[in-house]
Amino acid sequence: MKLSSFGLFLALQLLPALGLPSRIDEVDVSDPELIGLLKPDNVDKPANSIPLSKRSTSPSYAPYTVACPSGSLLRPASDGLSTGEQEFVDKRVSKVNSALESFISKTGLKIDTKSVLNDTDGPRLGIAISGGGFPAMLTGAGAINAFDARNGNTTSLGGILQSSMYLTGLSGGSWLVGSVAVNNFANITFLHDDVWNLDHSLFAPYDDAFENFYIYQEWFEQVLQKKNAGFNVSITDLWGRALALKLVNPLTGGANTTFSSVTNETWFQDGEFPFPIIIADNVIEGETVIPLNDTVFEFTPIEFGTWDTGVESFIPMEYTGTHLINGIPLNESCVRNFDNAGFLMGTSSNVFSGILPATNASLTASNNTFNNAVLSFLEMLAEDQLDVGLYPNPYQGYGNASNTTTTNPLEPYPIIELIDGGSDSEGIPFWPLLHPQRDVDVIFAIDGGYQSATSGWPDGSSLVSTYERVLATNSSGVRGFPYIPDTNTFLALGLNTHPTFFGCDGRNTTAGNHTVNDDTPPLVVYFPNYPWTMYANVTTYTVQLEDTLSSGMIENAAVAATQNNSDSFAVCVACALVQRSLERKNMSTPSQCASCFNQYCWNGTIASTTVTTYAPTVLSAKI
């Protein structure tokens, strides 16, 4: 990752401005001389510039304390779904079944829908949006737009969004999930046109240089509010403030918009759209490479925590930020407002922890003053734990209630350090959808990740990583996963050039050859980014996209997801949706589906030839 000189300068100012350890002289960001240094030549302050005094009245970013409920705040994972999530699922089941019936009827798939959809044992779909910055967000947005029945009959897959129970995201995918969740699940066109403002840089959101300076000063002040309230802060807080202006609220910046407040949104209370989940990876102090078996944390509007062995517990999202000892608050006070939506999305997409390992060699090789300064800055971030999201540990002193033989890896630490949800190479957030408590039958995996070895196009590596994690952990705590080939096979067989189904036969998965039941691993439908209407292989670190580019990427993803609005492919999608339900109920697979599976399911072949180059060309005209 390359830091712009402007971005580096502002990052360098953040640390002394917050009073944090630094090798840089103290700098007062409000000093008139500093403002003079930043003032562009021959540019006067515009009359309509927003005064700093008005910006200072923005809602507080600082967490605050409230009285705690009695008893332990931690819920063991062995309890199953939280009460709040279960209530949401119960409200949504009938809506999902109704949407599925409409979609299946529209496709013309000949099955007895009443038998398949007549109870809570009907198909349960989860949609997973990959990481990869704004390009991944836009790829996911294109797929979601194609899946949205609110767009009428303009796409062949309209209704899939309404048929889904869960929506997960990590890194750039978390930006999409978080943005739709806090904006009352507005449609993609509205978000693109009226919220995201991607034609302005993430690091320079306004046309006027003074406005950009003032917004940075506002962000500094907001993060200082949090620090002065007694909480650890890091560069992730500033990152989250920048993201929130793009993704949460372009007018106020969402300084006090929390993820738990999603429960107050009309769509959530009515169960109208899928349950949102954002994930981040835990990093233990001293780790420079994140292992594949790291602890994966979930953020939902209901709670924060993990199903993973050793911790296996959750705290209510509204009280995230409360430091607990053995599940009990230290001073009988609970923290509120810590779960800032921008901060959570910033945590899930925190790439700063990857900067030092990725750039150390190249910076060291070029022995010049600027590179040495950058390297020194990055080392400082790592040494002082300022390159991670810092969360007061609710698990300190907590013995795992469901498995006392397993050590809680977070037990000694007062602070949990969280980083980009794809840091363990699992670039698609499958993990929350594999836990048996959620009963997910099929996962639609939207892959907009940038892979440098394949000219920026997906190569299936994210599926491979999750498959390897499941094998390495012996499926501990999860239902298993379909068999996945190596990335060379993806390229050689073209599995990354179109939607590909994995696990079509529920008896042939990592769970073994067993009768298909509620514990059978889900079928995975893989939707890779591909150049149907344009070259959408934009680098992860792109922070500004012209409207024509961003809208074009959304359109390209929609065309790729629908296979250019193919009615025959829509039938095959319907087959994937109902397959596990048919298998569980011992119902025969329709002949239409047999033909679909022959075309789209990976048949187990492993490529023997090595692919050395991969550079696809634009495929078709627009819809």
From Swiss-Prot:
GO cellular component: cytosol; external side of plasma membrane; extracellular region; fungal-type cell wall; Golgi apparatus
Family, as annotated: Belongs to the lysophospholipase family.
Function text: Catalyzes the release of fatty acids from lysophospholipids.
Pfam entry (one): PLA2_B
Protein name from the UniProt record: Probable lysophospholipase 5
Species for this entry: Schizosaccharomyces pombe (strain 972 / ATCC 24843)
InterPro entries for this protein: Acyl_Trfase/lysoPLipase (IPR016035), LysoPLipase_cat_dom (IPR002642)
Molecular function via GO: lysophospholipase activity; phospholipase A2 activity
First-tier enzyme category under EC: hydrolase
The encoding gene: plb5
